[in-house]
UniProtKB/Swiss-Prot annotation:
Compositionally biased region (Low complexity): 86-106
Organism encoding this protein: Oryza sativa subsp. japonica (Rice)
GO biological process: interstrand cross-link repair; maintenance of rDNA; mismatch repair involved in maintenance of fidelity involved in DNA-dependent DNA replication; negative regulation of DNA recombination; negative regulation of t-circle formation; pollen development; recombinational repair; regulation of double-strand break repair via homologous recombination
Gene (name only): RTEL1
Domain Helicase ATP-binding positions: 7-308
Residue numbers binding ATP: 42-49
Keyword terms, alphabetized: 4Fe-4S, ATP-binding, DNA damage, DNA repair, DNA replication, DNA-binding, Helicase, Hydrolase, Iron, Iron-sulfur, Isomerase, Metal-binding, Nucleotide-binding, Nucleus
UniProt subcellular location: Nucleus
Protein name: Regulator of telomere elongation helicase 1 homolog
Amino acid sequence: MPVYRIRGVDVDFPYDAYDCQITYMDRVLESLQQGKNALLESPTGTGKTLCLLCSALAWRRTFGEFLRGGGGGGGGGGGGGGGGSQQPPYGSQPSGSQHSGGSASQSSRYPVIIYASRTHSQLRQVIKELKATSYRPKMAVLGSREQMCIHEEVSKLRGRQQNNACHYLCKKRWCRHHNSVAEFMRNNSELGSEACDIEDLVNIGRTKGPCPYYISRELSKSVDILFAPYNYLIDPGNRRSLNGIPWDNAVLIFDEAHNLESICADAASFDLLPNNLSSCIAEAQECIQLCSAKRTFENSADKQFDPENYAILKALLMALEKKISEVVIDSKELGHTKPGNYIYEFLSELNITSETSKKLIDTIDGASLLLEEGNSAETGPGMKAKATVCRLETIRDILDIIFRGGGQSHAKYYRFHVNECQQNSGDALKVLGKVSRTLSWWCFNPGLAMEEFLKLGVRSIILTSGTLSPLDSLALELNLEFPVRLENPHVIASDQIWVGVVPVGPSGHPLNSSYRTRETLKYKQELGITIVNFARIVPDGLLVFFPSYSMMDKCINCWKDRNHENSSDEHTIWQRICKHKQPVIEPRQSSNFPNAIEDYAAKLRDSSTTGAIFFAVCRGKVSEGLDFADRAGRAVIVTGMPFATPTDPKVRLKRDYLDKLGSASNKNSKALTGEEWYVQQAARAVNQAVGRVIRHRHDYGAIIYCDERFVWQNYQSQMSYWLRPYIKCYKKYGEVVQGLTRFFRDKVSIDSSKPNETDFNDNIVLLADKHKPQETISALAVTTANENQRTALSVNPTTKRSNYIKFAQITPANRSTLSMKHGCSSTSQLLYSGDKLSTDAQVIDLAADVATSHLAGYRFKSLGPKKAKVMVGSKDVCFDDGSPKLQHNVESRALAGCLGEQSTASSKKSNITHAPGNSGAIHEKSGGQESNAGPAFLKLAREKLSTAEYRDFVEYMKALKLKTMHIKDSLDAIAKLFSSPERLPLLEGFRVFVPKNHLSLYEQLVQSYTVPNT
């Protein structure tokens, strides 16, 4: 296993690392060593999770060996540390630490790594990656009771019902699983020393008996690394429940952090819905009755069961309901808005202040226990646990948010808002004649949640994702300094991706999904016909993302409506789409989503069809976290920018808040405007959607932006950094069809590792080994057989030289694993020989793509508006219906006859043959047959050119015939292709095929490539 020394730390990595992976680990170590926050963007497939784990754990090991046996272990040794440059252990214990037993003094000396991701399934993948490394830290993974409860009855419940039932049974010691945790932990002190996920803990519970949920809580008190979902850390209530975690000097890593700011803002906000408030009033009344009954039957004088307390609580809630209903709302669209600190004035009229809120919270806590006991009065050790929900806990959470820390300074980041709710016809409140209103207190500074971590004394906060861009706005939103930043390139070659902006459809009508045009019939039809053609060109799986569910429904309904068809075609647009791909539509209801995924998988497996098409929405479930690798996602179409509804009160107030904040800030300080935030939120959703395809090193696919607004530089600058070099804006739809068809024709022809079946596991499509670098370059990435050409792993010209110099300073600590026989030459420039780096060996250039770089910058002309077909390869590709027609002898005719009367070959009647004894020389023989000239020249070209170069040459010839490429660009490309010394016979011999009126131009090009510069 290779070991890389980066910033003085020896990092064990399970495979030979790509240069971009070394760069990533370098930034992680910079953040950890210097105690700075970091924003790290690296595309999916570049192994960021593996890099995070290896670099962070290598840094942690410099403080001492990993914990063993309930926190015991190495005792401050070197543990594979990095020598004198390593940091010393901390000299003092964290003030907020809570450790148990003898492990406290030792483990508190070392920083704990807390690794958070959005979902349990994502954490499962992270732990799987940990198992692939050589690191074996003491670890724990936190999960909810829904994932971990094994009690026969409680496991069937959900949410607060499950939590309350669990609390009650544990309090009564009626849960045998909870009762056996302490003894199990004493007898299994090594638990956590090997990587184990939630499923492993559940299996232990089912076979051995102890509760997996409480095992994980015990393990979390003394660990090297802790895995947890976002909400466990960001939500104040959940964070309070994590007793024993040493926050001081801890490292927080947020993976998949592209939505972190919205999660933070939502955690600090609340919406008090009218039905929730009514339920709270009903629960307060129930508490009164329970207390009265308890006093009567038990003759108890316990103040905790004083019904007067709950009568006061009920009266307060009813007064709050009445006060909300009396708020004057002038406009249903705008609602009633006040500055954030108005909430204190509003509540003070009900005698709810910072002081009285503490008593209210105590009363609500008592009510929660009372309701648990009351609803479980008949429950015994062998009886079912009853489901209970304490809505009053919602009021408790609201009071915590409003009176956090006992101060009011945070209110300046909020807006107070009251608005009328949409009512159903059977709404109980409407029947009672009450006004149905929602009281909201919205936080517009996501940085408040991050501030809490700083107060806890964390050392570094690392945010990473494949789609963090734009980084500046994210840093401004979170109100944190992020001195360490990275926008990594991808590890794929440039011929593995096609990115195009399609501004118009087949008829030339603009594609623009803005509110001005998206409702028009012409736009919907043009978009539909555009998708029909892409459904035919793209093999296997195709994803189509709409800005919203509403827009998706309207377009699909339009395509299905035969009355909207204004052509002679007997089929609707929807039927024509289904002719090429079997459709699946993302459901609005989350409960139906697994069925949609299974349906898509089944249709992909169906060998009688040409694939499936998944219609989905940006910010929906398809766009978040699913892995459409290989056949599951060969292309993604984005039909427009998913802007939030501008009239939505929360969106409108957020924009207004940012604009006012910017106008009040110092002119020298950077501030985010409301408009910038509005655009960037949409752009980030698009970036997340397009990230569903091209999921690993050998994957390939196309990204198609079907909206003319993506041509704008303002929009392109918001796209992920790694994607920008590949973007090409087309003017004509024919150019798009030509380029896309050629891309997939070339990829399919060399794809020798096509999966035979589709595997959907844990809602992840076509699972691929995302991080394991390959020793050799896949056939998907190789475009030439020329041994002198280097195959690129990414295109990033601006960083080529700087990366080479930087990586030359990083020496591999494990030299033997990086020798030539171990394949290092195929991954990086870290070739070690003695005490010096060797750069003589063959290396892969990470910054240039020689195989296709000569195509960049050429301008393609459009076909005429009346031309219904474009020539691509050896096929006629129609824009719409009709089977492709093979053309015989295309290559020969491209030379011998395609230029017609303009060719000098037709006037000279000459042919080209090889001169005996002079390999490669070309002579003209007057009086020869013109028909022999083309095949003879092609034969020589095949001998002199690589496979990819020969293919490019034929394409240039077709461009000359069809006039789809400017003549100067075509001739320049051909002359450049023939310019090497061994190909000069081709350069000279091609003269006979140049049109007469461009012969002088070709002569100039020949001279420029053959006359040496002086």
